[in-house]
Regions:
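The alpha-helix within a helix-turn-helix
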Residues: 167
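Membrane-water interface segments at the C-terminal ends of transmembrane alpha-helices
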Residues: 7-38, 54-131, 136-157, 185, ...
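Short cytosolic juxtamembrane segments of multi-pass membrane proteins
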Residues: 90, 256-267
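A short amphipathic helical element positioned immediately N-terminal to and/or at the very start
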Residues: 42-51
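Short glycine/proline-centered loop/turn elements that form peptide/ligand docking sites
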Residues: 159-163, 261-262
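Glycine-rich helix-loop "coupling/hinge" segments at transmembrane-helix boundaries
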Residues: 36-39, 205-232, 266-267
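Short, Lys/Arg-rich, polar N-terminal cytosolic tail immediately upstream
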Residues: 1-6
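Glycine/proline-centered hinge or cleavage motifs at structural transition points of membrane proteins
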Residues: 170-171, 184
Length: 267
């Protein structure tokens, strides 16, 4: 038995090698480039240049706003859809078809489905040239909505339905039960979906390029431009700023995710 455990321990070696080579080392390189100048010496020039540039601060602010707006829209649309899916009886083919319809676009290339969405909006009279922000937001919601529905659906399946019934037995109406019992119980799914949408939205550049016809510049577009121009230090610092923002967001939501039942209740 001891010999078997000894062998199993080494099965994780390829995993740790992969993490070191493709996660840790690239992250360390980004930090190094972000905190150094073109001569390779440690410097805060990138810090000063970024935070003294009003255009870049504006791009970061717009990216955060669009990320938050897209996250809110995805949750507002995805929550009732997830509720509808969980209320269907087991073995119902309709629920399987609906889940398949939400998952199928994820099987298609990201750029191709974004371009198809752009062409559909053209046909409806909404083009990125005249309505860049509207077209971009539609593209964002379309691409990231499944990432909200799936964790919400999973959380609602695990939710203790007896607590909902207890809320009604204690005299709560549907609105009170929804906001004071169901929402707290599904908060881990809401947070998971929000993080899965907010993080890629902030760093996205393909959707804004394709849907907005390059009339919208987000912080992801700035990072892409810097790396295309071989400006590794400036691009790495902006990427590091985004990593810090995302890390702060994850820390703020950590307690909510680890205590799903502690916040539920009628009062």
């Amino acid at each position: 038995m001891l010999k078997l455990r000894f062998k199993r321990k080494y099965l994780s070696i390829p995993y740790f090698i992969f993490l070191i080579c493709f996660v840790l080392l690239p992250l360390l390189l980004i930090i190094y480039y972000a905190l150094s100048n073109e001569n390779g010496t440690i410097s805060l020039d990138n810090f000063v240049e970024f935070f003294s540039n009003k255009n870049k601060i504006g791009l970061l602010s717009v990216s955060i706003i669009i990320g938050a707006l897209n996250t809110a829209l995805c949750i507002l649309i995805g929550y009732p859809v997830a509720m509808l899916l969980t209320k269907n009886k087991k073995g119902n083919n309709k629920i399987s078809i609906m889940i398949l319809l939400f998952i199928m676009p994820m099987w298609i290339n990201f750029v191709l489905r974004t371009a198809a969405t752009r062409d559909l909006l053209y046909w409806l009279g909404i083009n990125g040239g005249n309505y860049p922000y509207l077209a971009t937001m539609i593209g964002m919601v379309y691409n990231y909505l499944p990432f909200t529905i799936l964790p919400l659906y999973s959380q609602m399946l695990k939710m203790d339905k007896s607590l909902i019934e207890a809320s009604y037995d204690l005299g709560a109406n549907k609105v009170q039960t929804f906001f004071k019992t169901q929402i707290p119980l599904t908060m881990p799914g809401i947070i998971s979906g929000a993080m899965m949408v907010f993080m890629p939205t902030m760093s996205s550049f393909v959707i804004s390029d394709v849907m907005g016809e390059r009339k919208i510049q987000l912080i992801g577009n700035t990072i892409q431009f810097n790396f295309d121009q071989m400006r590794w230090h400036e691009g790495s610092f902006i990427a590091l700023v985004m990593l810090i923002i995302i890390g702060i967001s994850m820390l703020l939501t950590r307690n909510v995710k680890t205590e799903p039942n502690a916040r539920g209740g009628l009062w």
